[in-house]
Curated annotation (Swiss-Prot):
The protein, known as: UvrABC system protein C
SUPFAM superfamilies: C-terminal UvrC-binding domain of UvrB, GIY-YIG endonuclease, RuvA domain 2-like
Span of domain GIY-YIG: 16-95
Gene name tied to this protein: uvrC
One of the record's GO molecular function terms: DNA binding
Cellular location(s): Cytoplasm
Entry's family note: Belongs to the UvrC family.
The UVR domain, residue ranges: 208-243
Length: 647
């Protein structure tokens, strides 16, 4: 482990201007990015008294092997550069406020010809407008059920839309007037887009004009004695008002603001944000992240600065701003305290928004009351997380310690990798590699392998496949370790940058012996290898005649089972995907002269391979670009035992 004194720069060589600095580990990877008003003052504080640094910061300084910096002209430039570097390098010691994929949102796919309303979980995408997040998916479905009476926009999937377009018949929602049925041409793209725009306006807070419009239409229908239409409009108005009641007015002046609050202990920070648009709370979002203190920074001020820079930087990049209410950066951001560079932050946020953004601490009135509510939510979230953290941490620590003691390892296996092979009778043979760090899955390091040498033509050798995956994984690790030219100048991690402490194979003695032999051939002696057999959950050690038996109720065996089962799940998922692609594409792939474009045209025209198989030559030639010879070849490929293709 590097000694901070070995790479500490001379104080006089560090500039006093503002700038951004990067710490790198011995492999050249960027592990931390920070900024400072004075680079000299900030960097000197890292090395002045390492023992008194925050534990996470102290760990970073002792792992690092190099520090470098870039001087900028202003603090706004430093803020922007810091955000860009954190996004690019994903340093392991920086706090990351990633998109919370657990909360559902109401998504509107504005980038499509006929936009769709749907419940969505996952990372934000361009061309999609989001409302929420909501606490439960049923709350979104209930809102959609109410509002599609008034705004009958499409809610179906692309597959359902295409199918009903082909059969020229709307779905049930089209028959009960909860969808305008653009699939069958009841409305055109322009009319449907206007329905969606009205829906978005309503959810953005422009509610009153739609309620007044329905009341006016209802009165007009009653005056014309069209009581049936008046009754429908009455029901629509009732649905609209019910949807409005679900979003309580917190500010009567139509405020657009985000209210941010933090709760933290020595290790982690809980962040809560309430999104207020048009005076109504439109969504809530929360994170739990590890705490990381820079020397010389006040705790909460640093949290505010880091959160604003990362959260709004990412939101502004991901959202298309079609109108004022859709802007991801609100007019006002309410925070518990102002950082020292509040003016620079407000200026940067204003640049993202395109108009002035106010950064304030609420002191009194409704805004103060809402800020206190958000603060209570953050405290409650942290308290619940601490209870879960204590339980999870204790069980994970016990499991890792138990594995170390049982297997006689020098260190607890903080990084565990597991490999599994999946196939069906020797076809589509694939391998998977999953990674667990500190007892938790690290999905960004998962890898798939297509087996090249140990399988093919209907044959499969699990032992040889395990050996092939092991060899490919550790050969890449040796390249990363020994060939410095393979390290990117930006310090990005390679695919297999970190070796495991424990390498687990799914299988018994033959599989574990094969993996161990490969490591021995490669000269790797610091990685422990075991096999976990499914039948009796036995732990096999290389070249030992008998397995190690762990207690059935031990935390160690439970963790190893989780790792093995995750590798199996990952391998099965990839195998099924590969098999599905082969089975659906192979029939038309064999037709000579039929390229990808015309294959797609055929499937689009007929809707499925089954319908194409039942078609005649004349029907197939109706597809643009398909002649008689090609149509005949298609039928011969799909119906090799039928004589119709030659008729």
């Amino acid at each position: 482990m590097p000694d901070p004194a070995t790479y500490r720069p001379a104080t006089g060589s560090i500039p006093v201007e503002p700038g951004v600095y990067r710490f790198r580990d011995p492999y050249g990877r960027v592990i931390y990015v920070g900024k400072a008003k004075s680079l000299r003052s900030r960097l000197a504080s890292y090395f002045a008294d390492v023992a008194n640094l925050h534990p996470r910061t102290r760990q970073m300084v002792t792992i690092a092997a190099k520090v470098e910096w870039t001087v900028v002209n202003t603090e706004v430039e430093a803020l922007q550069l810091e955000y860009n570097w954190i996004k690019e390098f994903d340093p392991r010691f920086n706090i990351r406020y990633r998109d919370d994929k657990s909360y559902p949102v109401l998504a509107v796919t504005l980038g499509e010809e006929f936009p769709r309303l749907m419940v969505y979980r996952g990372p934000r995408r361009k061309g999609v407008r989001y409302f929420g997040p909501y606490s439960h998916a049923w709350a979104i479905r209930e809102t959609l059920d109410l509002l599609t009476r008034v705004f009958p926009a499409r809610t179906c999937s692309p597959g359902v839309f295409k199918r009903h377009k082909q059969i020229d018949r709307p779905c049930l929602l089209g028959y009960i007037d909860k969808c305008a049925a653009p699939c069958v041409g009841r409305v055109g793209a322009e009319q449907h887009s206007q329905i969606v725009a009205d829906f978005c306006d309503f959810l953005s807070g422009k509610t009153d004009r739609y309620a007044r419009d329905l009341e006016r239409k209802m009165s007009a229908a009653a005056e014309q004695l069209d009581f049936e239409r008046a009754a429908r409009l009455r029901d629509d108005l009732f649905a609209l008002k019910r949807a409005m009641e679900k979003q309580a007015v917190v500010f009567g002046d139509g405020t657009d603001a985000d209210v941010v609050a933090f709760a933290y202990d020595e290790l982690e920070v809980a962040v809560q944000v309430f999104h207020v648009r048009g005076g109504r709370v439109r969504g809530q979002r929360g994170w739990i992240v590890e705490k990381s203190d820079d020397p010389g920074d006040t705790g909460e001020e640093q949290l505010v600065e880091q959160f604003l820079a990362q959260f709004y930087g990412e939101q502004a990049e991901l959202d298309f701003v079609a109108d004022e209410s859709a802007n991801p950066v609100p007019r006002e951001v309410l925070v518990p305290c102002l950082p020292s560079n509040a003016d620079e932050l407000a200026s940067w946020l204003s640049g993202l928004r395109g108009s002035r953004v106010a950064l304030r601490v609420p002191r009194r009135g409704d805004k103060r009351a809402l800020a206190e509510t958000v603060q209570r939510n953050a405290k409650e979230e942290l308290q619940q997380h601490k209870l879960k953290r204590a339980s999870d941490f204790n069980s994970r620590s016990a499991a890792l310690q138990n594995i170390q003691d049982t297997l006689g390892l020098s260190y607890a296996p903080l990084r565990i990798e597991c490999v599994d092979i999946s196939h069906v009778q020797g076809t589509d043979v694939v391998g998977s590699l999953v990674v667990f760090e500190d007892g938790l899955p690290r999905k960004s390091d998962y890898r798939h392998f297509g087996i090249r040498k140990a399988a093919g033509n209907g044959r499969s050798d699990d032992v040889a496949s395990i050996a092939e995956v092991t060899r490919r994984r550790f050969l890449q690790h040796l390249h990363d370790q020994n060939d410095t030219n393979l390290l990117s100048p930006e310090g990005k991690s390679h695919r297999f940058a970190y070796p495991p402490n424990l390498y687990v194979v799914d299988g018994g003695a033959p599989q574990v012996n094969a993996a161990s032999t490969v490591l021995e051939e490669l000269g790797i002696i610091d990685v422990a290898v075991i096999g976990l057999a499914k039948r009796l959950e036995e732990v096999w050690v290389p070249f030992e005649p008998y397995p190690v038996i762990m207690p059935r109720n031990s935390e160690a065996l439970f963790l190893l089972q989780r790792v093995r089962d995750e590798a199996h799940r990952f391998a099965i998922t990839y195998h099924r995907s590969k098999r599905s692609k082969r089975m659906t594409a192979s029939a038309l792939d064999s037709v000579p002269g039929l390229g990808a474009h015309r294959r797609k045209a055929l499937v689009t025209h007929f809707g499925s391979i089954a319908r194409l198989k039942d078609a005649t030559v004349e029907q197939i030639t109706a597809v643009p670009g398909i002649g008689v010879a090609t149509a005949t070849a298609v039928l011969e490929a799909l119906r090799p035992d039928s004589s119709e293709a030659s008729e």
